[in-house]
Structure formats: C-alpha cells, structure tokens
Amino acid sequence: MDLLWMSNGRRVGIEVKRADAPTLTPSMRIALADLRLDELKIIYPGTRPYELAPRVKVIPVSDIPRLGA
C-alpha cells in the first residue's frame, strides 16, 4: 500500500499499479485487515473503474481528481 488516507473518519488505502489489470495481492488483503481499512483504491493506467473485491475499487489514473468527492 502506498498511502493511507484518512477522510471523515474513514480509513482508505491507496495503491498505485502500472499493470493494466491489477490483482488483489496477499499484502493488500493483509493491509485491509491489519489497518482496518474501510476501502482500498487501486490506481491504474486503464480507462474504466471497477470493483475488484468487496471494499476494493480499481480506479483509472484520470479519476484521481475525483477521489475526494
């Protein structure tokens, strides 16, 4: 995990990947549990956002300006 973002009492992990099709890694699962993350967002170079797993969203790099919205 590259960044822990606290927003309105929520714990959000941010992971940046170069892969076109990111996967949920064991270290991401550990971070979700150990850091009690409400959500993990994976930033990638693709074009469409999608849900990878419960509480895990994959987000295009072009959507970074909207992360706080």
Where do the language-model regions lie?
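A cross-kingdom feature that marks ATP-driven nucleic-acid transaction machinery
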Residues: M1-A69
